[in-house]
């Protein structure tokens, strides 16, 4: 039996949170800092020394020896440089532990050593990290010691954003301002601030670490590049919500405890659809905290797995033939007075503010579907989206029967008179309670689904930061809110104007609503008839960043400059090309050094067996050995030819000038060549004696953990 955990006692114990600040900061300093955190007012630099001292004292008391400016560069993972608290020794050789206000507020790093898309040249190395006081500092405790992590933004010497956090904070300010205007239009003048709230559901795989270390593809790329399906996959539907095995449960227990100590509100855990696949979901938080905490979740998942002899796979498609992993981004808008803008109430047809918000979101998603699709573009997601396991690459909105009925009433007659209800769930069993059903069902095939009081963006990849998706969501909805507020604030008759605006937006953007099965070919054809984009792969989605539409959208709200968008497009092309090249080279390495030599050894055994049987008994039937030897040899020849083709494709693609051209060449030429190499290898795995196969099979990986 494991020891009981007092969650309330340990929650946030490693976080410099509001409780700690209130205890340790002078009252006037605390009030000024709290004002900045809660209301978004400008940070007063004069309080930095007092905050730094209190933060250092708390950290040292908890065993910390170092601090770091913890930031999120455009690599998609976090970065940190550790400095000790030690100051210069005095004449007696003793040292004092220091953290100055300047060291808290500003750090410096090499801006050219991170992806910058040309914003930083090698000789222009200076980059700055700036303290984000809206996200609490925390202690990272592991085998390396205890480190005070100070969340920061990361920018170039000229102020260009080189990270994920800065644009997110900009977008939050943008939607805050415009959403407050919407509230005020409806007389809710007490609202002073609106914050996007996010709850990212994190899917992941766990495999045995010893087996993981035997596969170069998992080590180098995070996914398997070869592998035949075992006799059983996920077809029995017995893993989803199944009993959590003890080894996995012990991992989840330790993971939860680590996260709770770091103030991450880990809430739900369960087995997912694929064997060895699981999910962790947190409680909703402010968007910037949710983004930071999701990075902490992914890092902690890997650390805890390693300690327990496991490996955590966050790749979108670690195993071909079973479901991949995503990260559902649940998004809503909450006022400082406790109102959720996406709550339709019991009678949505009478909730005019909600209908306006809904119409604006429909407009935003329809007009900027390309940007929303691009925000979920990472190389691994190409293998997941539209594969009967995840939403299609076509952006559409699911609103459910109740809301769709209200929309239909407004579009057809100009007014809505009623809202459908869910009714009672009647089980027919006396001892089971009857209860009210939700007003609508769920649709797991939709990329952007309304689920009662929030929207769930389901396209985000499991390894990806949720920052970019929320940057796009916040900004495109801010634009729609602004245009609506501009029109309504100038109206002579508000009631008539808002009614006409809602109807107009619903009619103009009705095409984005789809409540059907997004997995079918019929939807692909229907979407084309509606004029909806189908950006099937990452490289096709990247150009959406550098359109005049995107420049104007992000520029108007100060979220990205034109230069920042162009840099991000270049970084995306480069990331895709590098990812594909690493995978291709890994396949070449595994095929040339492991699979082909193993198959040759096996064919020698077959040939020797054939010769021995013929010599011992000439009349014996050796057709099985002969057929197996011929089939194995033919596949070996096919594999060697495919290997040579892949090697040649890598060379020709590397010669392409420009990252855009190189990325497209990788998708058009290298990816198909990789598939051509994998096909004979996977067939050989089904023929070759397991004792000769050079690495663990799918069955070994996903069923033996």
Task: Name what the model sees in each region.
Residues 10-124:
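Active-site core of metal-dependent hydrolases
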Residues 20, 24-31, 50-54, 62, ...:
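Conserved active-site and cofactor/substrate-binding residues in soluble primary-metabolism enzymes
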Residues 125-314, 323-326, 333-570:
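Glycine-rich, acidic/polar active-site loops that bind/position phosphate-bearing ligands
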Residues 88-122, 237, 360-362, 484-493, ...:
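Short, intrinsically disordered, low-complexity segments enriched in Ser/Thr and Pro
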Residues 47, 71, 100, 282, ...:
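Active-site proximal loops enriched in glycine and acidic residues that flank catalytic Cys/His/Asp
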Residues 64, 68-72, 291-307, 333, ...:
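Hydrophobic/aromatic-rich, well-ordered segments within soluble, folded domains that form packed cores
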């Amino acid at each position: 039996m494991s020891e009981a955990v007092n969650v309330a006692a340990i929650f946030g114990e490693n976080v410099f949170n509001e409780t700690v600040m209130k205890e340790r900061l002078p009252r006037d300093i605390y009030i000024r800092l709290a004002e900045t955190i809660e209301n978004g007012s400008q940070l007063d630099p004069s309080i930095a020394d007092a905050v730094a001292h209190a933060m250092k004292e708390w950290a040292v008391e908890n065993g910390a020896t170092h601090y770091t400016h913890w930031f999120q560069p455009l690599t998609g993972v976090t970065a940190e440089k550790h400095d000790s608290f030690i100051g210069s020794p005095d004449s007696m050789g003793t040292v004092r532990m220091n953290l100055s206000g300047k060291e808290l507020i500003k750090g410096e790093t090499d801006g050219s050593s991170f992806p910058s898309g040309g914003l930083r040249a090698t000789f222009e190395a200076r980059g700055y990290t700036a303290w984000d006081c809206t996200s609490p500092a925390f202690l990272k405790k592991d085998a390396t010691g205890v480190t005070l992590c100070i969340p920061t933004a990361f920018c170039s010497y000229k102020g260009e954003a080189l990270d994920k956090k800065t644009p997110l904070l900009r977008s939050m300010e943008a939607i805050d301002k415009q959403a407050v205007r919407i509230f005020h239009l409806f007389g809710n003048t007490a609202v002073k601030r609106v914050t996007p709230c996010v709850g990212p559901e994190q899917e992941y795989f766990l495999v045995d670490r010893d087996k993981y270390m035997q596969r170069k593809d998992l080590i180098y790329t995070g996914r398997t590049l070869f592998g035949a399906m075992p006799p059983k996959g996920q077809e029995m539907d017995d893993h989803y919500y199944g009993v959590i095995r003890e080894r996995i449960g012990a991992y989840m227990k330790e993971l939860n405890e680590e996260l709770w100590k770091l103030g991450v509100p880990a809430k739900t855990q369960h087995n997912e659809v694929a064997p060895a696949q699981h999910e962790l979901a947190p409680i909703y938080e402010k968007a910037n905290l949710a983004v930071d905490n999701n990075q902490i979740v992914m890092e902690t998942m890997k650390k805890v797995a390693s300690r327990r002899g496991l490996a955590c796979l966050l790749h979108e498609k670690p195993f071909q033939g079973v479901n991949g992993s995503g990260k559902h981004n649940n998004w809503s808008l909450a006022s400082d007075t406790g109102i959720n803008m996406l709550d339709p109430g019991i009678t949505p047809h009478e909730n005019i503010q909600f209908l306006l918000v809904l119409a604006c979101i429909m407009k935003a998603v329809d007009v900027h579907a390309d940007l929303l699709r691009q925000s979920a573009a990472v190389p691994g997601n190409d293998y997941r989206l539209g594969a009967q396991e995840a939403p299609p690459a076509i952006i559409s909105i699911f609103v459910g029967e109740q809301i769709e009925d209200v929309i239909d009433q407004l579009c057809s007659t100009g007014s809505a008179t009623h809202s459908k209800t869910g009714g009672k769930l009647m089980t027919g069993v006396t001892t089971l309670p009857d209860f009210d059903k939700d007003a609508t069902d769920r649709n797991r095939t939709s990329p952007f689904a309304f689920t009662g009081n929030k929207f769930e963006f389901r396209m985000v990849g499991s390894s990806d930061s949720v920052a970019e998706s929320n940057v796009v969501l916040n900004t495109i909805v801010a634009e729609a809110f602004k245009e609506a507020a501009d029109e309504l604030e100038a109206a002579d008759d508000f009631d008539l104007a808002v009614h006409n605006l809602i109807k107009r937006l619903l009619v103009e953007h009705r095409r984005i609503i789809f409540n059907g099965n997004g997995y079918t070919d019929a939807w692909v054809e229907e979407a084309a008839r509606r004029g909806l984009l189908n950006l099937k792969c990452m490289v096709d989605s990247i150009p959406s960043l550098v359109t005049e539409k995107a420049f104007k959208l992000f520029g108007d709200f100060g979220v990205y400059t034109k230069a920042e968008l162009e840099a991000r497009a270049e970084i995306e092309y480069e990331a895709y090309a590098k990812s594909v090249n690493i995978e291709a080279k890994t396949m070449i390495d595994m095929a040339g050094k492991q699979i082909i030599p193993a198959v040759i050894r096996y064919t020698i055994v077959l040939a020797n067996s054939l010769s021995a049987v013929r010599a011992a008994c000439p009349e014996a039937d050796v057709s099985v050995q002969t057929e197996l030897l011929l089939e194995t040899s033919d596949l070996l020849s096919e594999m060697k030819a495919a290997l040579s083709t892949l090697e040649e494709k890598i060379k020709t693609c590397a010669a392409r000038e420009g990252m855009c051209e190189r990325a497209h060449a990788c998708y058009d030429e290298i990816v198909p060549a990789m598939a051509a190499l994998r096909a004979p290898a996977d067939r050989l795995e089904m023929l070759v004696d397991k004792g000769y196969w050079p690495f663990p099979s799918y069955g070994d990986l996903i069923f033996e953990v």
